[in-house]
Swiss-Prot record:
Gene3D superfamilies, sorted: PurM-like C-terminal domain, PurM-like, N-terminal domain
Main location: cytoplasm
Name of the protein described by the UniProt record: Phosphoribosylformylglycinamidine cyclo-ligase
Source organism phylogeny: Bacteria, Pseudomonadati, Pseudomonadota, Betaproteobacteria, Rhodocyclales
Reactions this protein catalyses: 2-formamido-N(1)-(5-O-phospho-beta-D-ribosyl)acetamidine + ATP = 5-amino-1-(5-phospho-beta-D-ribosyl)imidazole + ADP + phosphate + H(+)
Biological processes, Gene Ontology terms: 'de novo' IMP biosynthetic process; adenine biosynthetic process
Pathway: Purine metabolism; IMP biosynthesis via de novo pathway; 5-amino-1-(5-phospho-D-ribosyl)imidazole from N(2)-formyl-N(1)-(5-phospho-D-ribosyl)glycinamide: step 2/2
Organism of this sequence: Aromatoleum aromaticum (strain DSM 19018 / LMG 30748 / EbN1) (Azoarcus sp. (strain EbN1))
Family of the protein in this entry: Belongs to the AIR synthase family.
Keyword Lipid metabolism: no
Gene this chain is encoded by: purM
Enzyme Commission identifier(s): 6.3.3.1
Amino acid sequence: MSSPKPSLSYRDAGVDIDAGDALVDRIKPLAKRTMRPEVLGGIGGFGALFELSKKYREPVLVSGTDGVGTKLKLAFQLNRHDTVGQDLVAMSVNDILVQGAEPLFFLDYFACGKLDVDTAAAVVSGIARGCELSGCALIGGETAEMHGMYPDGEYDLAGFAVGAVEKSEIIDGSRIVPGDVVLGLASSGAHSNGYSLIRKIIDLAKPDLDADFHGRPLRDVILEPTRLYVKPMLGLMQAIPGVVKGMAHITGGGLLENVPRILADGLAARLDVSSWTLPPLFQWLRDAGNVDAQEMYRVFNCGVGMVVIVSAAQAGAAVQNLEAAGEIVYRLGRIESRAEGAAQTTVG
């Protein structure tokens, strides 16, 4: 007589439902801290409900999605998981801010091969912190435990932000003209871009990541989370309506490829390299990797995380407002007419 077949469970297949439930319990108080009055219900429903405020006359929804890229590989290597969540939020909310949108809510996707509740909770704590700093609600997400899809200890992240802007106040760069001033808001570090090159440089240079680097361990400088520009920029736009003619979030492609995205074909941005100092991290990356200057400006933010274009007449007031909000602001250059075939953004 044959022996009875064993009774299999989802856990036998590599999926721990109890761990998922435990994570949800850890997430709920984190998400609660981010709630806005417009949120209807809490975490755990099939869908998240958000009531659009009546303060908008002609609201236009603005959405964005992004990830953290290979910065995650360094987080795995250094066993540091509490900062990449803020990166995830910043990459999307800074993007939708560019069009003048106020971020309203955020959802995340966390995928792994084997769910480690402590690791996932650390990631979500960073997501919640990013939502708090940008004033948007963490209203939902998905945790996908997929045995065999990812190596143990590794995971991937995606984030989704939705915001709103008055139709008449959409910022699309159409009001930019020659003579306008290009301002730059300081970045906190490499943010979430260029990490494939950063990892290559680390592999070749083999620095001591625990060594002091200008007062902090190098590992902390490299993993410094992306700066959130939402509250200072929304404050500026509220204080001086119409002051912002265009914005560019300096992400993949650096200054050279992101600023042109908001310029008409006949315009160019001329940025003065002497208007700001290359931060120590980027100096080290340049020297350790022997990276060409133009490649630096095409890969990294080089210390400028957000570009803001304003009229020359309002530049002083804009700088004063942003500095009062805690931002470091550089006068990077000006907008000029562009000759046919000329580059739309130069740094020199």
